[in-house]
Regions:
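Catalytic phosphate/nucleotide-handling subdomain of diverse soluble enzymes
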Residues: 69, 88, 168-251
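Glycine-rich phosphate-binding loop signature in dinucleotide/nucleotide-binding domains
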Residues: 49-52, 152, 177-179
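Alpha-helical scaffold segments in soluble metabolic enzymes
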Residues: 11, 15, 41-45, 88, ...
Length: 264
């Protein structure tokens, strides 16, 4: 397995004059892990509760969950698409970068035949730990699923079904992994009020909100996670990613690229 990380840390360190830590995923992969998800390392550090089950749900292009159970158990994995398919579809038909508050999707209706086709994706049945990305869930994947239908739904109904797909895959994973508890969303999808409401309806008895309610800006949590990982590496601390990526042992993630001043 191989992961290509964009951005050259040598150039970043040289031009900014700041010691840079980068390329976190490949060390995890070298230790037998999948290289993702890594943000759960911070989730367990700052979001766990000793007396409540909690889940942190990061909805970026891909959605992932971190289960932080009160008994100390930790599980994290990618559930499937987050915003990626909805963003692709609305960009194609409306020229927008994203469906603000899920408004376009809300005006449509879920097509059950199309939803069933989406839910037949084999990745969804794999056991954790598992990770995925745009190499699977992309425009070509969506076209293949649509091509299997006898009749295409309207573009707006497709958008409604894609929102339901994200909500269903997330809620299914959460219900299977956690009995009751609190669910906090972060990432760009946390701003999609229609998606947040739909997840709440699919999970009666659970509290559903955003990480802002536990003191963390939903837009900053992933950046915070990598800053925290960088500090662990600078301090010479190995981190245990085994519950999340399947790595065989704790490792120090990323390489250190000194600033020009510290290197001289």
């Amino acid at each position: 397995p191989f992961s290509l990380q964009l951005g050259d840390p040598n150039t970043i360190a040289e031009r900014t004059g700041i010691t840079t830590v980068a390329d976190f995923r490949r060390r995890d992969m070298a230790a037998g892990g999948q290289g993702a998800p890594l943000a759960p390392l911070l989730h367990q550090h700052c979001c766990a509760s000793p007396n409540k089950n909690r889940a942190i749900v990061n909805i970026g292009g891909i959605a992932n969950i971190t289960l932080l159970l009160a008994n100390g158990a930790r599980v994290a994995f990618d559930t499937g698409p987050g915003n990626v398919l909805m963003d692709l579809w609305i960009a194609r038909h409306n020229g927008a970068r994203f469906d603000k508050n899920g408004e376009w999707a809300t005006g449509g209706s879920v097509d059950t035949a199309f939803l069933a086709e989406l839910m037949s994706e084999p990745y969804l049945a794999l056991a954790a730990p598992k990770s995925t990305g745009r190499e699977l869930f992309n425009g070509a994947w969506l076209e293949q699923r649509l091509a299997s239908l006898k009749q295409w739904p309207s573009p707006q109904n497709i958008q409604a079904t894609l929102l339901e797909f994200t909500a269903t895959t997330l809620s299914t994973a959460l219900l299977a992994g956690m009995r009751q508890g609190e669910i906090y969303l972060c990432g760009g999808g946390a701003h999609n009020t229609a998606l947040l409401k739909r997840i709440g309806k699919l999970m009666p008895g659970y509290y559903v909100g955003t990480t802002a309610e536990i003191g963390i800006d939903p837009d900053w949590l992933e950046a915070m996670a990598f800053a925290w990982m960088a500090q662990q590496t600078l301090d010479g601390i190995a981190v245990d990613t085994s519950p999340f990526t399947g790595a065989k042992k704790p490792v120090m993630l990323g390489g250190i690229y000194p600033s020009p001043t510290s290197a001289s």
